Regions:
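Short, polar/charged alpha-helical segment
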Residues: 40-62
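Short, well-ordered beta-strand elements
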Residues: 30-41, 61-65, 132-133
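A conserved helix-loop-strand patch within extracytoplasmic ligand-binding domains
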Residues: 106-156, 254
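Ligand-binding "clamshell"
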Residues: 94-106, 119-121, 193, 198, ...
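Periplasmic-binding protein-like
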Residues: 108-118, 143-150, 205-269
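Beta->alpha turn/N-cap motifs
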Residues: 41, 65-69, 79-93, 110, ...
């Protein structure tokens, strides 16, 4: 009898417009709740959209926000959270190697693209031979920038360099570009002198730049630096993982990403 009364109450609430129909269904059907760690900002905002979709499909999502990204994988490995969405595949692999965590990437999430910014050029077609360009000096940033430039056919890299390329791995440079490697905090100032500057998404945001609006070219959505959804190795085949991935890759979340960020946050799925 109590069950009948409860169901009638839910129906009346929906009928009267007090509760969104999807919410009522979710309240009735959620069978598992998972804790997902994210960093504040883009990843937390997107996961909130994922949470709404997942609830309508029977999966509850508790969002756990971290101010310090270095703590997220540790929390996941220690079982304090069930999944994480905050880092790209290359950073995850580096953490696995350094700390021995048994963590696996189960799906791509979004790409926060490195992009090329310029105060002198409207497109790469205007780039002149011998121009000076600025790229990050740190190993990860330099490699990412060089891979981007290779994809733009501006340079050719030694095949074995892979995602660890340095300027020594440049075997072809068709416009004889002059490269200046700078600390990340000096890249913005280089816009005054360089033909273009390669800046990653996090740094660009801090500088008030938006990749889709302000760059002359940006990284492909299916970059090897796409961010990933991560779980413990022991959990990767559990049903809730597939549910979480499906919610993230849903049309509703795709629409949210496009309308909220345009192309400054890119979708690799």
């Amino acid at each position: 009898m109590k069950r009948v009364v409860h169901c009638v109450a839910v129906w009346l609430a929906v009928a009267c417009g007090l509760v969104h129909p999807g919410w009522a269904v979710a309240a009735e059907t959620i069978t598992r709740t998972v804790r997902v760690g994210v960093t504040r900002g883009v990843h937390a905002e997107i996961l909130d959209a994922v949470k709404r979709v997942a609830a309508t499909r029977g999966l509850g999502v508790d969002i756990v926000e971290f101010d310090d990204a270095s703590r997220v994988d540790t929390a996941l490995a220690d079982g304090k959270i069930d999944a994480a969405s905050f880092e790209d595949a290359q950073r995850l692999e580096a953490t696995r190697t350094a700390k021995g965590y048994a963590l696996s990437a189960v799906a791509p999430t979004v790409t926060l693209p490195m992009a090329l910014y310029s105060r002198k050029l409207r497109s790469l077609n205007e780039l002149q031979p011998g121009a000076t360009v600025a790229i990050p000096a740190d190993p990860r940033g330099m490699a990412r920038a060089l891979v981007l430039l290779q994809n733009d056919t501006l340079v050719t890299l030694r095949a074995k360099a892979g995602l660890h390329a340095t300027l020594r791995d440049v075997t072809g440079n068709r416009l004889a570009l002059k490269f200046v490697a700078l600390r990340r905090d000096r890249l913005h100032a280089a816009l005054d002198s360089a033909a273009f500057v390669a800046i990653d998404s996090d740094d660009a945001t801090r500088m008030g730049l938006q990749p889709a609006r302000d760059s002359i070219n940006l990284e492909d959505a299916r970059s090897p630096y796409a961010n990933v959804l991560t779980v413990r190795d022991a959990d990767r085949t559990k049903p809730w993982v597939a549910q979480l991935v499906a919610a993230y890759h849903s049309d509703d979340v795709a629409h949210f990403i496009l309308t909220r960020y345009q192309d400054s946050v890119r979708r690799p799925w």
